[in-house]
Amino acid sequence: MSIKKYKREFILIGIIILLVGSVLLKNVLKKDSNIESPNKISQKKNNDIFPDIDNLTSWIVYWDLNVDNEINMLNKKLSSISYFAVNFNQNNDLIVPEKLEMYYDKTKSYNYEKYITIVNDIVNDDGISLLKDKEILNILLSDELSREKHINDIIDLVKEYGFDGIEIDYEQIKDDLALWENYILFINELYSEALTNNLKLRVVLEGNTPIDKLNFTEGPTYVMMCYNLHGSFSEAGEKSNQDFIKELMDKMKEVPGEKSFAIPTGGFDWKDNGSTKSVSEAEAEQILIENKIEAKRDDKSQYLYFNYTDKENIKHEVWYADQVTLEYLSQVIIEEGYDVSLWRLGGNLFSK
């Protein structure tokens, strides 16, 4: 065989190798582009979830942070997430739970606004907790100097971590009008400082807030909790329904400015021995599988419910929300032109 012929064959083989290599490389790169980074939520919009909502807000909680899949499914519909929650120690210092701090560090780059929620819970060094403590509010809000210090502490914390906004969720004030007066002064003063520091402010209100006796001012976004219709304090039933939400929307008409209405995920499991525990949609579905039973849907609320007897021969009644329930509850809010908030992420399947 001549040298020229060898050269032609070598050149031909080289061209074939280059062509095959380029095809293989293209396929590898294509495959790699479809692999999600473990620290980055996909930004693909899922139009099957809450099709009428493009401005959904929600919460994540420090004791249940297995929520990346839910964020991924809701995706661009999520305009903001509140990180729940900062509490107080026995010295009235603001404390960020370690797990929440770690999750925030992981999700700083995610494409939604990030609020930090502050609650009036006290967690002592000995582990004893005082939930929704009214006394600490009296201490923090009783006079201008105390409010100023508390506001400065909040602003410093938010700026240190780089949150986009503040959410205040101080509860169990009930009919204490003197405390409400100081609380509203605090909200107004905090809003002014938040504006100065280019921060947003949300204020969460309970359904029993005596709105007709109070003078809220325009500025913050006010979020009404549209749940606790049934719970550990009551007989079995839905956590919310459209009539209940309509009542709260009517009540909130006296509050000026932007408003959002929060609907609940999950539900409760009532035992006939008197005890009750909260359940997520995923937990309720697991009970159905284990007991080989099916849930029924309540016509009025669109909640799912079922009964079962456990291994200890104790009877249970379970009511919980799924995607159908949440979309049904949100519809009445959307029709009035308000924003929807979802309490909370964690244990939701979002599968009709």
Language model features with spans:
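Glycan-recognition patch characteristic of GH18 chitinases/ENGases
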Residues: 27-148
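Substrate-binding surface in catalytic domains of secreted glycosidases
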Residues: 59, 90-98, 176, 181-288
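Catalytic domains of carbohydrate-active enzymes, especially glycoside hydrolases
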Residues: 67-90, 154-166, 332-340
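Active-site groove signature of glycoside hydrolases
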Residues: 150-180, 228
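Glycan-binding loop/region signatures in secreted carbohydrate-active enzymes
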Residues: 123-136, 264-329
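Short, acidic/polar
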Residues: 62-75, 144-159, 206-213, 321-332
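N-terminal Sec-pathway targeting helices
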Residues: 2-15, 27
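Hydrophobic faces of well-ordered beta-strands that scaffold small-molecule active sites
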Residues: 56-58, 79-83, 114-118, 166-168, ...
